[in-house]
Amino acid sequence: MQTAEPDIKAMNAMGYEATVLGNHEFDNPLQILDMQEKWANFPFLSANVINTKTGKTLVKPYTILNKQDLKIAVVGLTTEDTAKLGNPEYLHNVKFEDPTTVAKATLKELNEKVKPDVKIALTHMGYYYDAKHGSNAPGDVSLTRNLDKGAFDMIIGGHSHDPICVDDKGVWIKDYQPTQPCKPDFQNGTWIMQAFEWGKYVGRADFEFKNGELKLVNYQLIPVNLKKKVKKADGKTEYVNYAEEIPQDPEMEKLLKSYQDKGDALLSQKVGKLNGKLEGDRTIIRFEQTNLGHLIAEAQR
């Protein structure tokens, strides 16, 4: 509704230093993406999304961050599935190249020209445990396995909406619960991390760089006021935080209040009537036909 303006303004306030193009950046005309880039105080990245008119990347392929005398290269990579997930009306002059092939070429350029101390892939490709991606385009695990060992020090990913936590044996904890101790996946010398979806967690990874080597010291998925239902002694139930409550930031609230009010006004407009529930649960609608799917298909005919 608001072309991600409040999202980007909030990301500016939080100090984001980079973001990667995902499939939803191509739901709208590219002019919207241009406008979003202007709003942002940080670069939009993707090394494998090509503007076929110019033959160049649509946005910056990578950025270099300088932290405590370290050169940190951050490379953006986007799922090839965007070609079928994005709005075809806006993809005429856009090509999505193979992320692995592009990563190899980009790393070669970085290693020769920049010589970074740390190399990070910021991806929107998805996490598919043991590279079992099914009908989806290959994700982060496939990427690491098809590159040289440790080609990237770490991958910070998205797209599949997963909390990446593995146990001591390296097995993915599918039913991860907030505050449960865990560590990121480690594939072919590369740490793979993802902090679930929709701001439910803040992902934190602490690394130590010493004598040219990077070592993971700590990894956390910090729940943002997520609650669980507990039964009290009197038999009644209540919802309590999994972890210490994170207080609302008054400056952020002030920044976003007008956008919230505008969104509420748009969402409160009556557009029709329902006689029953529209089934949109992800675990159902992505695997079988539902009345919501039928409604959307009819609307698009």
Predicted regions and their residues:
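Acidic, metal/ion-coordinating pockets
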Residues: 1-225, 287, 292-299
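Non-catalytic terminal accessory segments
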Residues: 1, 224-301
